């Protein structure tokens, strides 16, 4: 009986994924699409866009950073939502 109870507790912990972390895209506009598992506590993804002599640059990653004026920032809170 104790073995069954212990097994149920272990299965419950594994299924609940108590250490859940967010997954976000983390590639720049000119790079192949890649993802990153964010650090614990980072619950959002961002998409940051700006223009320079190379054209429009898009940067993606975990978190929701503070940006300078003239930089477009979008933050979201679901899996790989920052494409």
Swiss-Prot record:
Bridged cysteine pairs (disulfide): 24-45, 38-62, 64-75, 76-81
Swapping residue 49 to A leads to an effect described as: 1.35-fold decrease in potency of inhibition of Torpedo marmorata acetylcholine receptor
Q: Which residue ranges are recorded for the region named Loop III?
A: 64-75
UniProt-reported outcome of changing residue 54 to E: 187-fold decrease in potency of inhibition of Torpedo marmorata acetylcholine receptor
Tell me what effect the entry lists for residue 67 to A. 2-fold decrease in potency of inhibition of Torpedo marmorata acetylcholine receptor
Residues the UniProt record annotates as site (Key residue for binding to acetylcholine receptor): 29, 31, 48, 54
Q: What is the effect of changing residue 37 to A?
A: 2-fold decrease in potency of inhibition of Torpedo marmorata acetylcholine receptor
Effect caused by changing residue 59 to Q: 1.4-fold increase in potency of inhibition of Torpedo marmorata acetylcholine receptor
Q: Does the keyword rRNA-binding apply?
A: no
Effect on the protein of changing residue 68 to A: 32-fold decrease in potency of inhibition of Torpedo marmorata acetylcholine receptor
Q: What is the effect of changing residue 71 to Q?
A: 2.3-fold decrease in potency of inhibition of Torpedo marmorata acetylcholine receptor
Swiss-Prot/TrEMBL keywords: Acetylcholine receptor inhibiting toxin, Disulfide bond, Ion channel impairing toxin, Neurotoxin, Postsynaptic neurotoxin, Secreted, Signal, Toxin
- Cellular component GO terms held in the UniProt record: extracellular region
On the tree of life, the source organism's domain of life is Eukaryota
Phenotype for residue 32 to N: 2.2-fold decrease in potency of inhibition of Torpedo marmorata acetylcholine receptor
Q: Where is this region: Stretch between loop I and loop II?
A: 39-44
Q: What is the effect of changing residue 66 to A?
A: No change in potency of inhibition of Torpedo marmorata acetylcholine receptor
Keyword Disulfide bond appears in the UniProt entry: yes
Quick one: effect of changing residue 53 to L? 7-fold decrease in potency of inhibition of Torpedo marmorata acetylcholine receptor
Q: What is the effect of changing residue 28 to L?
A: 23-fold decrease in potency of inhibition of Torpedo marmorata acetylcholine receptor
Site features described as Very important residue for binding to acetylcholine receptor, chain residue numbers: 28, 50, 52, 57, 59, 68
The reported result of mutating residue 27 to A is: 6-fold decrease in potency of inhibition of Torpedo marmorata acetylcholine receptor
What family does this chain come from, according to its entry? Belongs to the three-finger toxin family. Short-chain subfamily. Type I alpha-neurotoxin sub-subfamily.
Function of the molecule: Binds with high affinity to muscular nicotinic acetylcholine receptors (nAChRs) (tested on Torpedo marmorata, Kd=21 uM) and with low affinity to neuronal alpha-7/CHRNA7 nAChRs (tested on chimeric alpha-7/CHRNA7, Kd=0.07 nM) and inhibits acetylcholine from binding to the receptor, thereby impairing neuromuscular transmission. Blocks the extracellular increase of dopamine evoked by nicotine at 4.2 uM concentrations. In vivo, produces peripheral paralysis.
What is the recorded name of this protein?
Erabutoxin a
Organism taxonomic ancestry = Eukaryota, Metazoa, Chordata, Craniata, Vertebrata
